[in-house]
Amino acid sequence: ANRRAYDYVVAGMRSSVIKGTCKSANRSDYLVCGKTGTAQNRGQDHSVFMGFAPMNSPKIAIAVYVENGGFGADYGVPIGALMMEQYIKGKLSPSSEKRAEEFQKRHIAYGSRNR
């Protein structure tokens, strides 16, 4: 594959984190690259996020797929961001710990619209 094409993809994924649908994954201590997706379904859409970090020296690449989770930014991005933080930092910050607890309490109504 062409290095220039790779650089364009990385720049696009970084842009999505800075000013697009992946904003909630943005961090000041390491650069995250990612892309959301919404897989349409007869019921609630599926939430998808793929990303990697740090941008210039990746240590983790992740794909998150939440069945009936809605838009990619609804569940995929926040869950993926928490997983990357845990892997890279070895633990979650207190605010991320709180966010993880909130996500564990959420209920997804499979097969129905719940937005």
Regions found by a protein language model. Name each.
Residues R3-P94:
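Active-site beta-strand/loop architecture of penicillin-binding DD-peptidases
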Residues I79-R115:
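Short, gly/Ser/Thr-rich active-site loops of penicillin-recognizing serine hydrolases
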